[in-house]
């Protein structure tokens, strides 16, 4: 008899829209897919940057089991020491020792579920613009894999470019259970089970504002940035909402992914879709 574990992985939670669409839909999704575990990237949960203690607890109450992060992990300074040390939260692993917060939290964790040792790892790509140094994610993950201390290994690769994520997949196909790209907030159309049995997608997408936003932010600010080089704090758009994620099932005996499916829910507000931004150019 096959022993399998079913997972839901949700992309970057961005602001109030992302929090609420998860709260309103996660229980139904867990029931639909009979999911055993839910993993969420929460690096943009609090006003678009970082994760506060209040919103960490919000996600847990909504039914999230484990949380991954990204380049905005350290933005919510007030709650940082508490949140980053939560046993079910994984911040980026490949931090250089010169980074002030490199010794806070964990970049990878191992837990047991259904007689399987499961590892979750969070890594930053070399293509993400950062104000601090990181170590090479390829070399860091290889070193971790060589420990051979888990049955399943779920990797959240928080990176900017499609080429780096594709290269990551080619390098680690069959050596980890999943390689899920995060960070760009736009879901890619390449979800697949690789020839060696890993699940891969270049970017899962986000749980946040809908199509009336620019990857979650107000369009006006993004247009001014690209047209005039305007540098301002991006505000989270109030237009509708979208939820993007991946369902996947793993055969514990073979350690291979046997099923994947993209998850997408869109709840757009037509008022924002009809806005005219032409005169901003």
Swiss-Prot record:
Its cofactor is Fe(3+). Its EC number is 3.1.-.-. Fe cation 1 binds at residues 12, 43-44, 185. It holds the Pfam family YmdB. Fe cation 2 binds at residues 43, 71, 158, 183. Keywords: Hydrolase, Iron, Metal-binding. The active site is at residue 72. Transmembrane segments: none annotated. GO terms for molecular function: 2',3'-cyclic-nucleotide 3'-phosphodiesterase activity; metal ion binding. CDD domains: MPP_DR1281. The keyword Metal-binding applies. InterPro entries: Metallo-depent_PP-like (IPR029052), YmdB-like (IPR005235). Belongs to the YmdB-like family. This is Putative phosphatase/phosphodiesterase MPN_349. It comes from Mycoplasma pneumoniae (strain ATCC 29342 / M129 / Subtype 1).
């Amino acid at each position: 008899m096959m022993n399998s574990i079913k997972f839901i992985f949700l992309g970057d939670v961005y602001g109030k829209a992302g929090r609420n669409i998860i709260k309103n839909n996660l229980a139904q999704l867990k029931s639909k897919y009979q999911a055993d575990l839910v993993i969420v990237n929460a690096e943009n949960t609090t006003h678009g940057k970082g994760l506060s203690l209040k919103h960490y607890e919000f996600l847990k109450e909504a039914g999230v089991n484990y949380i991954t992060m990204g380049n905005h992990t350290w933005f919510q300074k007030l709650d940082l020491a508490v949140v980053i040390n939560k046993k079910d939260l994984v911040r980026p692993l490949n931090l250089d020792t010169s980074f002030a917060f490199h010794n806070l939290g964990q970049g990878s964790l191992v837990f047991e579920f259904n007689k399987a040792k499961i590892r979750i790892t969070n890594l930053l790509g070399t293509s993400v613009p950062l104000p601090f140094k990181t170590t090479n994610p390829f070399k860091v993950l290889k070193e971790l894999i060589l420990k051979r201390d888990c049955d399943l290994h779920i990797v959240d690769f928080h990176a900017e470019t499609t080429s780096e994520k594709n290269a990551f997949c080619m390098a680690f196909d069959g050596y980890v259970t999943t390689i899920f790209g995060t960070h760009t907030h736009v879901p890619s159309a390449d979800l697949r089970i690789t020839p060696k049995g890993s699940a891969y997608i270049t970017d899962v997408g986000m749980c946040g504002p809908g199509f009336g936003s620019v990857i979650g932010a107000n369009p006006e600010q993004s247009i001014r940035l690209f047209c005039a080089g305007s540098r301002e704090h991006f505000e989270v758009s109030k237009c509708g909402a979208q939820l993007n994620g991946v369902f996947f099932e793993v055969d514990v005996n073979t350690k291979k992914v046997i099923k994947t499916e993209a998850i997408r829910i869109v709840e757009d507000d037509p008022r924002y879709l009809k806005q005219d931004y032409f005169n901003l150019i």
